Amino acid sequence: LSAKDYKTLLQEYVQHYHSGELEYKVIGMSGPDHKRVFTMCVSIDGVVYGFGDGGTKQEAGQNAPQATLELLNRDNV
């Protein structure tokens, strides 16, 4: 799967199994300006399920839903 597919898959998962709101939020930045690392979390109904890091907000925003889906599939939440 491409990274973009994880966002779509998570959206479909939430629509099918949850009735709540899916939210992505940047929760941290670290590193120097030329090598910044962004950390993003994914929450469903206000409950945080996964985190993702990346050199850009977009990269972190692609890694976070992947980690969330892995957690949800592992725990069958």
Task: Pin down the residues of each PLM region.
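Double-stranded RNA-binding/processing signature
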Residues: 1-77
